[in-house]
Amino acid sequence: MKLNSFPGIVNFLLKDLPTNDYPVLNSRLFCSIWFTGILDKGINSLRDLFYQLNHTGTQVDLSTFSKANKTRDPQIILGLYHKLLHYIEKAHPEKKLVLCPFDATVIPLMSKLFWLQGHRQVKLITTLNQDTKSTGHLIISPGQKHEINFGEEIMRMLPENGVAVGDRGFCSRKLFDKFIENNTLFIIRIKSNWKWDENYHIATGKDKVRVICFGNVQQKIEYYLATNVPEEIMSNEEIGEAYKQRWAIEVLWKFLKMHLKLDKMMSKNLNGITIQIYVILIVYLILQLLKVPQMYGSKLVGKLRYIQIVIRRELNFVNWLNRVIPRLNM
């Protein structure tokens, strides 16, 4: 079964969610409300969300939803995310090597409730598979812990044939050693003041990795890259071109923050924030799978606008789900 229509993807995603596990706010309705909040551009807070829902036929209290965000196990949302990831992986033939840029982004927490707990930001780390255009496992860490401390978790994100591509924030000899011990290939930009020998190798502590230098003539910038990818697999020129694909994850962060509210955390607790982040990434994966009429184009923002127009005909996602896919109610 090939998923490319919005109803088909939603049906595949939500059909197994229970509708009778909670008396007031069942799991399917809980997830549907979150999708409404992310997909509707005019909603910027939970109060906005529930004002719309309560005036269009969905009788659930904001307090009930807020309590569910605080107490419910986010595994049900994680299950939806990994269900889509598994489908995308199966739909793409495996390649010998896949470039996987990885990076961290900071999500500010604006509520004073978080400040009182000592949290002013959440750090999100993931990879972006350049073959499937899908994100990988997520690291969600409150506080200011540096991303370089998540080396082992980052390695577990990568597919077996993945090449980790990272920026200078991840340049560390200890991290390089961890990659080497784990037989994980990497291409990571290093600082220009690092020293290397006459054969363009730097010692990591347990091994040596080669250094590649390339420049951007227009910007007058030189890049120094450390890699353990053998030269017979990727030449210096290919390493330079591979590093340029790291920019794709920066574009991802920009899209998620501009269009899917990654920088607007609506929940007032860390459990709810984890749920919102996963819903945002689920919507991103839906957009990657979705095929829309040609007039909307092939860019993600065009696909998102198409979904918003479709849903708006039924006022919001909850109503659309109940009317367009009634078999999910059975």
Regions found by a protein language model. Give the residues of each.
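Single, function-defining residue in the core of a domain
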Residues: M1-S45, T64-F65, N69-R72, G79-Y81, ...
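Extended, structured, electrostatic nucleic-acid-contact surfaces
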Residues: K41-H55
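Short, basic interhelical loop/turn and adjoining N-cap
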Residues: Q52-K67
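Non-cleavable N-terminal signal-anchor transmembrane helices
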Residues: G57, H92-E94
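Short Lys/Arg-enriched helix C-cap and helix-to-coil transition segments
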Residues: Q75-E89
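Short Pro/Gly-enriched beta-strand edge/turn motifs at strand-loop
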Residues: V106-S111
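Extracellular beta-strand-rich solenoid/capping regions of secreted or surface-exposed proteins
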Residues: F114-L116
